[in-house]
């Protein structure tokens, strides 16, 4: 793991020692080199002793998420250049440093062996994200969004800390690799129910579960582009990753306790998809679509079958790339039109035809068009939930239908129609933006050719 963490730490001197005009080039190239070196993680064997140490370990669940985190940093730096154009150089360097801190914490969170270390790093990711949202957001509402984000995450995570201390006293160890062997099965008592709730609640807030999702649209809408990208692509996946790890030691309680959460997810999935159909704000629409997709992942994890785990892992990776790309596209519209309202961007296809192609590709992957990995993930989850209960097929089908509707609604509203009078003299799409979109799209297309490398630990 140090071969990734040490080069990431070396990004700090690269950032602060670069001459002002060279910051963007140096940091982008260095972070891209790290992510290309990290691609080797995808081609690994679970039983190799190179992957395990007392502090860090990587297996087929954490590796794709680590690679996704590393792949995203150069993309975030590329996307932020226009947003920071008027900032002084010191603040630009500080902004990039926050992104590097975030990448470092995320990599260590996904590979932590001890659950307490995982918890500390899980909470540490909050600090750079909060600074990015509250310092570099566009409107004054960013402070309110930051407050929501902070308190939802902290209050949701506190019971987890208490539960982990209790398990530490009971077992004497919180090592993820050994816990599943030495942890006795929980009895069906009130104390076990509370322990299960405490362990799972932090991740439910992070995912977020429908009902605990109010911080997400606020944070997404007010965050700058890099904040939105990392929130949608990686921070939501922390919840899914944590749930997959912690449910291994909570059996057989998950079977009994999961029902209300499954109902809430299946209901919330339909509700948030329906909310998307009524949105006028582009970033808000993409944020609500994230809640809908993550509800599918929660359903998959709580069903606890190998197929559902595979579906959850694929969906997390696919959604990370797709939603990040959608936020980049929304940002490129915002840079030209200076509004997030979709109707004001209508007819933009006639001026920016290549950007319209990226919009089409992003919308199609979002609605899970065959043969995209989004579809493979949704099919796995649908089949797993159908074997759990036949009725879920109706809800899953309805969700797929509404997802297709709002994805096409988003595409037609922003791209088609009569051009508005203020849109005639827009900047053309830059090479930087097209490179950015292609680097989101390329992994999605390549994973389609070989999805087994992101099928997770149950494959």
Curated annotation (Swiss-Prot):
Disulfide bonds: none annotated. Keywords: Electron transport, Membrane, Mitochondrion, Mitochondrion inner membrane, NAD, Respiratory chain, Translocase, Transmembrane, Transmembrane helix, Transport, Ubiquinone. It comes from the Eukaryota. The chain crosses the membrane at residues 22-42, 60-80, 90-110, 113-133, 145-165, 194-214, 224-244, 257-277, 284-303, 308-330, 351-371, 391-411. One of its GO terms (molecular function) is NADH dehydrogenase (ubiquinone) activity. Belongs to the complex I subunit 4 family. Core subunit of respiratory chain NADH dehydrogenase (Complex I) which is composed of 45 different subunits. This is NADH-ubiquinone oxidoreductase chain 4.
């Amino acid at each position: 793991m140090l071969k990734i963490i040490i080069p990431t730490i070396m990004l700090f001197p690269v950032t602060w020692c670069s001459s002002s005009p060279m910051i963007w080039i140096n940091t982008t190239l260095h972070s891209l080199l790290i992510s290309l070196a990290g691609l080797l993680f995808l081609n690994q064997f679970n039983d190799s002793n190179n992957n395990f140490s007392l502090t860090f370990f990587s297996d087929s669940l954490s590796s794709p998420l680590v690679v996704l985190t590393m792949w995203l940093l150069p993309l975030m730096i590329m996307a932020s250049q226009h947003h920071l154009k008027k900032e002084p150089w010191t603040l630009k360097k500080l902004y990039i440093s926050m992104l590097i801190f975030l990448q470092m914490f995320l990599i260590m969170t996904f590979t932590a062996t001890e659950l307490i270390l995982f918890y500390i790093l899980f909470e540490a990711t909050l600090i750079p994200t909060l600074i990015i949202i509250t310092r570099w957001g566009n409107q004054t509402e960013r402070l309110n969004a930051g407050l929501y984000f902070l308190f939802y995450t902290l209050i949701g995570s506190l019971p987890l800390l208490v539960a982990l201390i209790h398990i530490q006293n009971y077992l004497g160890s919180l090592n993820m690799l050994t816990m599943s062997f030495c942890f006795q099965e929980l009895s069906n008592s009130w104390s076990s129910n509370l322990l299960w709730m405490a362990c799972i609640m932090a991740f439910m807030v992070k995912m977020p579960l429908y009902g605990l999702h109010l911080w997400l649209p606020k944070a997404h809408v007010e965050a700058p582009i890099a904040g939105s990208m990392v929130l949608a692509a990686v921070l939501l996946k922390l919840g899914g990753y944590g749930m997959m790890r912690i449910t291994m030691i909570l059996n057989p309680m998950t079977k009994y306790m999961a029902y209300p959460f499954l109902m809430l997810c299946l209901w919330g999935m339909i509700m948030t998809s329906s909310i998307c159909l009524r949105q006028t704000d582009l970033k808000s629409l993409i944020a609500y679509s994230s809640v809908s997709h993550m509800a599918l992942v929660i359903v998959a994890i709580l069903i606890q079958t190998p197929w559902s785990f595979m579906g959850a892992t694929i969906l997390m990776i696919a959604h990370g790339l797709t939603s990040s790309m959608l936020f980049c596209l929304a940002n490129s519209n915002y840079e030209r039109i200076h509004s997030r309202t979709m109707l004001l961007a209508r007819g933009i296809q006639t001026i920016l035809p290549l950007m319209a192609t990226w919009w089409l590709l992003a919308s199609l992957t979002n609605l899970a068009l065959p043969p995209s990995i989004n579809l493979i993930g949704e099919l796995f989850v649908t089949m797993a939930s159908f074997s759990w209960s036949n009725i879920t097929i109706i809800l899953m089908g309805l969700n797929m239908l509404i997802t297709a509707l709002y994805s096409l609604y988003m595409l037609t509203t922003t791209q088609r129609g009569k051009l508005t009078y203020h849109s005639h003299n827009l900047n053309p799409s830059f090479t930087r933006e097209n490179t950015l979109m292609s680097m989101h799209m390329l992994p999605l297309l390549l994973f389609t050719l070989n999805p087994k490398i992101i099928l997770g630990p149950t494959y």
